Amino acid sequence: MDWLKRWFTRKDQDKTETTSASKRAKITSSLLMFSALYEAKKPLKYTIVYILALVNAFFLLVFIQQTGLYSFGISSLTQGFARLLFVLLKNLEDGQRNLVFNIFYWLFYVIVNIPLIIFSYKKIGKRFTILSTHYVVASNVFGFIFSIIPGANQLPSMLSAVHHTEFWEDAKKAEGVDQSALFVPFLWNDTSQGNVIISTFIYAGIYGFVNGTSLAILYILGSCAGGADFLTQYFARKKNRSVGPILFYVNTFILIIAILMGSFVAGSIVLQDIPDYKKSAWQVNLFFSPNLIATFFSVLFTGTVVSHLFPRYNFAEIKVFTDKIEEVRLALLNDKATHSLSIQETMGGYSLAKKRMIVSVTMYVEIPNLIRIIRKIDKDCLVSITRIRGIDGYIYLRSQD
């Protein structure tokens, strides 16, 4: 019987060890990327804005200006106009021609933004507009400075192969074509441009990711990239929902006009001076070029990245399990923003003791602020966050300015 007693004793000990193997651990996960930036202070905001402006200027120069692609929105108009102007001013010296091109490509966009900046100041708010204006001016001034550096007009490495295509060989033989040939969209029927077209899509994807990330961070900081973004932010804040589909159509219309100017018309003018390619001028396939498709690919990729990194109009339910229920409640009530707030009765699963928890429905972007307030009162409480697929009714939203 001793062996039986020892066996049961060992089993009991094993159970105890298994139970004691469980330990209390702190788990932290976030529904938001760059969550720390939602509460960034003013000096940090401006520092990040200028860094983003510098990065965007570089990528815009290398991945858009030099590749025949376009940005999205109003900036595409100034880009298309600058390309058309470059082709038309072929009688100017190269230095003057490039200077005029860069002024209209970069600095003219700042001028176009002036009425939109005034609109934003009156309709959206002071802080938002000032921060956005810093970005608009800085990114385009940086871009202009980069563009006038000697050698800045050199093609990216993967696109330099365009100089070895059949089209480029014929363009070099034509009189007065020179750099204007770079503004001719890639041609579907020129098999020698196959590798260059693939490279263009790669560059479009890279720029789409970088641009989407930059835009998301700007939105998180409480600013935008200017242009049509001012209108986007105004309608989004007024309607308290994303107006992406409507603005996508508006920006697409603007982009089509830009491509008509900077690629279709400008490209056709250049092709008329190249004997073997005269027939390609003013053809429909010149408009529906690889450049157009790659541009839309970049735009869609940008939108996808922004939606993932800045889910502004997504909602979540927050449950706070704390023994300091009254202190947390008062802290939330004393916050500058009004939060939806309810208290529910619960029962402990082990002790069967009655407890209470705080429940709040809020936007994703408000979660870091709520957790910060709660943690000031109770560093050890459990905060549960659940995504909400849909919502219908009134809810308190923090003022944006």
Swiss-Prot record:
Sorted keywords for this record are:
Cell membrane, Membrane, Transmembrane, Transmembrane helix
InterPro entries (UniProt xref): DUF2179 (IPR019264), N-reg_PII/ATP_PRibTrfase_C (IPR015867), UPF0750_membrane (IPR051461), YitT (IPR003740)
The residue ranges crossing the membrane are: 44-64, 69-89, 99-119, 130-150, 201-221, 246-266, 286-306
Superkingdom as given in the UniProt entry: Bacteria
Membrane topology according to the record: Multi-pass membrane protein
Q: Where in the cell is it found?
A: Cell membrane
Could you tell me which Gene3D superfamilies the record lists for this protein?
Answer: 3.30.70.120
Q: Give a yes or no for keyword Transmembrane in this entry.
A: yes
Task: Provide the Gene Ontology terms for cellular component.
Answer: plasma membrane
Is the Transmembrane keyword given for this protein? Answer: yes
The entry's protein name is Uncharacterized protein MG443 homolog
